[in-house]
Swiss-Prot record:
GO cellular component, one term: cytoplasm
Keyword Protein biosynthesis: yes
SUPFAM superfamilies: Elongation factor Ts (EF-Ts), dimerisation domain, UBA-like
Name of the protein this chain belongs to: Elongation factor Ts
Length: 200
């Protein structure tokens, strides 16, 4: 497959990697944008991968209040410098993350912050269901892992499809912001309140 300038541009915008690295990634992966993104991440060439370890001590508290006034969200979005914290794109990202939380009500930012006991309970539910359906033991673990991946997409903010573009996840959106702004950005704590909802 011929690699076009448009494909290289799209990959570069998505990852922030250099033009030649993007071209090589596309060539190595038969023109597949998705595989090229993974290839760049594995090689550590995407800006998000390079910036992941840098401290984020500045930022904003993004907020969203639904037009009905019955749902509100506060989310901590952190970056490295106050210059970026004041950037319009950064603030728009914080607002979009707050809207995502309002719409999808995630339980955690990422898989690492989910209580392991909850994950183990979910695994057991998937195991039992597979056994009841008479699935062979050798494929039950694959079924369980598939179920857990789906579970993460429901409860983990970074794994959820973005409400404004379901072809990308919040993690993809975060990586785009990192590439665009040129510094590490992280999503910290969040709180979602809904009028009349029971506290968990």
């Amino acid at each position: 497959m011929a690699i076009t300038a448009q494909m290289v541009k799209e990959l570069r915008e998505k990852t922030g990697a250099g033009m030649m690295d993007c071209k090589k990634a596309l060539e190595e992966n038969g023109g597949s944008l998705e595989k090229a993104v993974d290839w760049l991440r594995q090689k550590g060439l995407s800006k998000a991968a390079k910036k992941a370890g840098r401290a984020t001590s500045e930022g904003v508290i993004g907020n969203y209040i639904h037009s009905t006034g019955k749902i509100a969200v506060l989310v901590e979005v952190k970056c490295e410098t106050d210059f970026v914290a004041r950037n319009e794109k950064f603030q728009e990202f914080a607002k979009n993350v707050a809207m995502q939380i309002a719409a999808n009500n995630p339980a955690a930012v990422d898989a690492e912050s989910v209580d392991p006991a909850i994950i183990e309970r979910e695994r057991e539910v998937y195991r039992q269901k597979a056994r009841e359906e008479g699935k062979p033991e050798n494929i039950i673990e694959k079924i369980v892992e598939g179920g857990i991946k789906k579970f993460y997409k429901e409860i983990c903010l970074l794994e959820q499809p973005y409400i404004r573009d379901d072809k990308m996840t919040i993690r993809d959106l975060l990586n785009d912001v990192i590439a665009t702004l040129g510094e590490n950005v992280t999503i910290g704590r969040f709180v979602r309140m809904q009028l009349g909802a029971e506290e968990a």
